[in-house]
């Protein structure tokens, strides 16, 4: 909550209750509530985490929601401690306060509930060594790693990658203190167009009808293991993932011994479930 910094507002409580009800069909299903998000969705974290009293109330509110909905855990998606993303409040003490907040949440919800966090590809902003005993696993947002005419989520480095790619993101988190078996690789169900000089997000399900992509030709980057659409000069104009590239990433996650994979996000997949089915098949084969 952006006014008192301790209450937790669920965007669509009716829909979330429907999701929680899925546990009746599959009792082994794990459902977590993710709190935060990009930009103003993370407003209030810094103000709350710097105050011991507010940390405790926030943690108790997390516990209350777990009990109310009968779900399995909390995911903290603070984007990002110490960073003024989209103008949100931040302080250099956020990293230390983040750990204190997570300790308070763990104390409130107990050891039998899941506590996870979302982290950018750079592995900055967190003290992972201090968080290791508190957090069950880290969801690496190994996407949004592109500038103009670059891959959004390359598995490996190529001439079309920016400063980060999936393999590097995993390595940085491992070097920062988190073991591979507690790392989850993020998979994007969307891409970015560089047509017209502006980076524009386009969902996988909308690719065929998107006018910006007309006249572009699909190519495969054999080094980065991702597809892209290029103009007549071979210049990357649209970066995205498809079933093939997600298959390579799932194979990498299994061979590397990662905790697993996660996707962002369900709504961006097509009606046939092309991407989520590809991920499921690759992870279960």
Regions found by a protein language model. Name each.
Residues 50-68, 120-129, 240-254:
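Short, acidic/polar
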Residues 1-14, 60, 81-214:
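Substrate-binding surface in catalytic domains of secreted glycosidases
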Residues 72, 136, 259:
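Receiver (REC) domain switch/active-site residues of two-component response regulators
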Residues 18, 22-25, 65, 100-108, ...:
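Alpha-helical structural signal in soluble globular domains
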Residues 265-272:
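A short, acidic, flexible beta-alpha connecting loop/helix-capping segment that sits on the rim
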Residues 33, 76, 105, 138, ...:
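Conserved, mostly hydrophobic/aromatic
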Residues 181-252, 272, 277-285:
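Glycan-binding loop/region signatures in secreted carbohydrate-active enzymes
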Residues 1-66, 276:
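Glycan-recognition patch characteristic of GH18 chitinases/ENGases
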């Amino acid at each position: 909550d952006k006014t008192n910094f301790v209450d937790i507002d669920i965007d669509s409580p009716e829909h979330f209750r429907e999701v929680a009800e899925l546990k009746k069909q599959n009792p082994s299903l794990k459902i977590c509530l993710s709190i935060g998000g990009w930009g103003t969705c993370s407003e209030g974290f810094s103000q709350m985490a710097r105050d011991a009293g507010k940390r405790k109330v926030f943690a108790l509110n997390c516990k209350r929601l777990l009990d109310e909905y009968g779900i399995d855990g909390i995911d903290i998606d603070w984007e990002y401690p110490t960073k003024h993303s989209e103008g949100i409040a931040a302080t250099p003490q956020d990293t230390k306060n983040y750990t204190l907040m997570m300790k308070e949440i763990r104390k409130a919800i107990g050891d039998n509930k899941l506590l996870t966090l979302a982290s950018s590809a750079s592995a900055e902003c967190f003290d992972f060594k201090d968080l290791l005993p508190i957090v069950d696993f880290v969801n690496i947002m190994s996407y949004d790693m592109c500038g103009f005419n670059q891959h959004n989520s390359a598995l490996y480095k190529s001439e079309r990658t920016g400063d980060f790619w999936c393999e590097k993101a995993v390595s940085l988190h491992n070097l920062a203190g988190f073991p591979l078996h507690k790392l989850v690789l993020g998979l994007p169900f969307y891409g970015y167009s560089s047509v017209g000089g502006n980076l524009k997000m386009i969902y996988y399900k909308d690719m065929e009808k998107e006018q910006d992509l007309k006249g572009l030709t699909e190519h495969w980057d054999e080094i980065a293991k991702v597809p892209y659409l290029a103009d007549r000069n071979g210049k990357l104009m649209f970066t995205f993932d498809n079933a093939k590239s997600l298959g390579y990433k799932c194979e990498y996650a299994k061979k590397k011994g990662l905790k697993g994979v996660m996707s962002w996000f369900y709504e961006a997949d097509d009606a046939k479930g092309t991407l989520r089915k590809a991920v499921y098949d690759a992870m279960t084969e």
